[in-house]
């Protein structure tokens, strides 16, 4: 195991707290019979054997023991592959993990989905699930339904890391894997690896119980917990996921500390604050901000960022991924491939000065282009982290969205999460083909009486030019923009025809052809690149009517489509809400532009400070 994989495993050991074991061979008794009550006074006065003939009762006792042994034997026959529950749970406990145990009691002809639905809630909190393949009468349908219910639950809740270990005595694990893969019928899943079905956040893996005659996949119960944790570690194979898991583990570990810090002795203070402020609902946000601040403090004190993202972790990551990285710096047809130690140093210390000094010694012909790390050459040099499956550019787009947005349309999973119109809300106007950012102060977007005029800054599409925002777009935006583009093409073609008719079959306005060629180049992928206009006069003001809660609430029309409608029934597609500081920065530029003062001064003097 590499140093980086060991680092990830240590974080997994901190994070994983709960495991659910589902097996019909768990060995739990179906029922317990109460012992007959004995009156001790009567027992003392009684004669153990009133008659020697009572010795015959001993034969009855022997018969009873034989009967119990026979029943136990029959129970073992019903369970083809029993589970050594004690060894398995003790092995998890030794690792500090709570192992829950469930032995299904499946009723005759019980519907599969009804049974699986019962498991759904209890399994939702388990990081790892150990599941037997056949839970009754050589029937795998119940286990497959459980897996599907768990996957559906994870999708509906916004996703989570999950490892499911199919632990069975059945042979032909490849066939079992393919059977489950076909049953799940999910295009996001991959079954190309042996004994495995996986996706970005899911790992379903097949192992055999002891005695199954498959030495390659056989794992004893006391060894299974370590195997399960190794499988879970595969889901955390990255710097950023290990950081997120380390932070989550720290919050889990400090849950008691957090709750005691926010104790009931603060109730009176909170209520006092609520009754004293002009708008009582503001007190709820006040407490939320205090809670978030306290959690951030816990993470900072624990140095979670440094441990998971610092120099040592970077060194381990580069060592682990070096064979798969591009490592090549290219400029003007020349290139240089970085050595391992060089890539580690650049990753730890950055490009500034370091990249220029390196190339000045190793590849002088391209070194000068990297002397100023703020120039485009250095920006393109991040391709050293490209792999066969992904690029640093694509990764940077995703991180820029994460750092700019509180949430986007991709993050809304529940009806209670539907957004309302507020400062920082980004929408797309279907009728005007414009991207608009709400800049109305937050306090003016709540407690609305009937209707309110909202102000929006216009964000210009700047594909191929300088941009300050990357925005994910849904299919509704793509379809609308494509329709507008096609309509515009038809208009230009009509203008070209009219131009030639008017000019006797000759073209006079060649700019129309240029416009048509530009429209034909238009492509609509998963992102739009925008630049915020700082011109105050470009602001748009639109009136929206509020709901009963005195806010302008969006309408969810499909899984990825949420819209606002103004008082004239124009549609605005919600794309996301920016982080507060990101919004304030853009509003600040607007205000600065508004406050510009033009001074007519001596040109010689003006050039001294320009």
Name what the model sees in each region:
Residues 331-403:
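Charged, compositionally biased non-catalytic regions
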Residues 379-434, 438-440:
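Short N-terminal edge-element motif at the start of the domain
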Residues 1-347, 435, 443-610:
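Extended charged low-complexity segments that act as oligomerization/scaffolding linkers
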């Amino acid at each position: 195991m590499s140093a980086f994989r060991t680092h990830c495993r240590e974080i997994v050991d901190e994070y994983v707290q709960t495991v659910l074991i589902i097996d019909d061979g768990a060995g739990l008794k179906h029922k317990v019979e109460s012992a007959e009550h004995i009156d001790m006074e009567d027992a003392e006065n009684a004669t153990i054997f009133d008659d020697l003939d009572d010795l015959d009762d001993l034969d009855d006792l022997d018969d009873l023991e034989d009967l119990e042994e026979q029943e136990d034997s029959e129970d073992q026959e019903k369970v083809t592959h029993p589970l050594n529950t004690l060894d398995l749970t003790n092995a998890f406990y030794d690792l500090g993990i709570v192992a829950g145990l469930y032995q299904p009691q499946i009723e005759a002809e019980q519907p599969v989905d009804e049974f699986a639905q019962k498991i759904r809630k209890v399994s939702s909190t388990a990081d790892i699930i150990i599941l037997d393949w056949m839970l009754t009468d050589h029937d795998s349908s119940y286990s497959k339904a459980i897996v599907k219910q768990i996957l559906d639950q994870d999708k509906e809740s916004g996703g989570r890391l999950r490892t499911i270990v199919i632990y069975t005595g059945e042979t032909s694990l490849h066939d079992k894997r393919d059977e489950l893969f076909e049953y799940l019928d999910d295009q996001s899943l991959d079954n190309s690896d042996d004994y495995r079905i996986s996706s970005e956040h899911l790992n379903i893996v097949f192992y055999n119980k002891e005695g199954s005659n498959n030495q390659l996949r056989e794992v004893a119960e006391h060894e299974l917990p370590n195997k399960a944790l190794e499988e879970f570690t595969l889901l955390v194979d990255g710097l950023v996921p290990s950081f997120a898991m380390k932070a989550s583990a720290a919050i889990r570990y400090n849950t008691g500390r957090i709750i005691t810090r926010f104790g009931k002795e603060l109730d009176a203070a909170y209520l006092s604050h609520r009754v004293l402020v002009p708008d009582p609902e503001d007190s709820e946000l006040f407490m939320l901000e205090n809670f978030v601040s306290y959690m951030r403090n816990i993470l900072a004190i624990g140095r979670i960022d440094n441990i998971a993202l610092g120099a040592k972790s970077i060194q381990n990551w580069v060592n682990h991924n070096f064979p798969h990285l591009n490592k090549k710096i290219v400029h003007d047809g020349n290139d240089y491939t970085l050595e391992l130690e060089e890539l580690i140093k650049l990753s730890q210390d950055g490009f500034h000065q370091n990249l220029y000094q390196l190339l000045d010694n190793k590849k002088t012909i391209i070194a000068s282009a990297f002397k100023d790390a703020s120039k485009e050459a250095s920006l393109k040099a991040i391709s050293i982290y490209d792999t066969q499956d992904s690029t640093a550019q694509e990764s940077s787009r995703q991180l820029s969205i994460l750092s700019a947005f509180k949430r986007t349309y991709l993050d809304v999973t529940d009806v209670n999460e539907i957004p309302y119109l507020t400062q920082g809300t980004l929408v797309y106007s279907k009728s005007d083909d414009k991207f608009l950012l709400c800049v109305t102060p937050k306090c003016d977007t709540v407690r609305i009486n009937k209707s309110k005029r909202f102000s929006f800054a216009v964000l210009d599409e700047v594909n191929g030019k300088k941009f300050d925002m990357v925005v994910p777009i849904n299919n509704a935006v793509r379809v609308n923009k494509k329709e507008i583009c096609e309509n515009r093409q038809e208009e230009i073609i009509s203008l070209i025809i009219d131009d030639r008719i008017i000019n006797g079959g000759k073209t006079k306005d060649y700019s129309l052809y240029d416009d048509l060629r530009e429209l034909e180049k238009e492509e609509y992928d998963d992102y739009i690149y925008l630049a915020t206009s700082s011109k105050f006069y470009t602001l748009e003001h639109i009136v929206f009517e509020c709901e009963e809660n005195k806010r302008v609430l969006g309408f969810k029309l499909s899984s990825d489509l949420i819209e606002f409608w103004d008082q004239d029934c124009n549609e605005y597609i919600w794309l996301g809400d920016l982080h507060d500081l990101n919004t304030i920065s853009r509003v600040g530029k607007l205000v600065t532009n508004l406050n510009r003062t033009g001074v007519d001064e001596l040109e010689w003097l003006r050039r001294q400070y320009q």
